[in-house]
Amino acid sequence: MKITIFGATGATGTCLVEQAVATGHQVTAVVRNPARLATPAGPRLRILTADVMDPAAISPAVTGADAVLSAVGPRGSGPTTVSQDSARSIIEAMQESGVRRLITVSGSVVSDIGEGPLMSYLLKPIVRRTLLRHVCADMRRAEEAIGASNLDWTIMRPPRLTGKAATGTYRTAIDRNLPGEYTISRADLVTCMLSLLDDESSMHRHIAIAN
């Protein structure tokens, strides 16, 4: 499958590029600085230098793709619009190019559905008002923009991401969080994302995932 990956130089994006290439996909990685890309260009990996915030600049990367995957997200906990701005730009480029399949990474902090009382009524509200206030608001607006689009989207909602090796063992839930599950390895998250590329049952759904 021909896939385009945004956020390819981040921790999750790096893993996504590596697994996508290793499993035989034809990958276009969109980066601002090619020197930061861990996987070198090759027969299955094309590198395009562009700013994800510029729909016209990323259009060549999206055109002809079977699917787009985004691991773009903010760094740090300060004020940010990275998630929402990149989502709107990607949506515009995809709509102009006629590409419909989008899988993107958000976070479990955005939703309380499926959580137990302690998490829903105490811990998450505190986190959303304090430590992750800006990040959560940004993710929520990105999700709203994606949900309002005409794309065949899937939004991944992982809890805390770790750098542990893939286990191949993870749980998922549709449109609700997994209670009592607090981590997922990036490697397992990426494995799941790639498995959903042509899964119609995951379209227009929020997928929780945890180890």
What are the language-model segments listed below?
Residues 111, 115-135, 178:
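Alpha-helical membrane-targeting segments
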Residues 43-66:
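Conserved Rossmann-fold cofactor-binding substructure of NAD(P)-dependent oxidoreductases
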Residues 115, 165-170, 196-205:
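Glycine/proline-rich active-site loop of Rossmann-fold NAD(P)-dependent oxidoreductases
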Residues 75-102, 137, 141:
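NAD(P)-cofactor binding segment of oxidoreductase domains
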Residues 82, 86-87, 138, 156, ...:
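Substrate-positioning beta->alpha
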Residues 143-164:
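Conserved beta-loop-beta element that borders a ligand/cofactor-binding pocket
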Residues 3-23:
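N-terminal Rossmann NAD(P)H-binding glycine-rich loop of SDR-like oxidoreductase domains
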Residues 30-35, 51-52:
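N-terminal Rossmann-fold cofactor-binding loop
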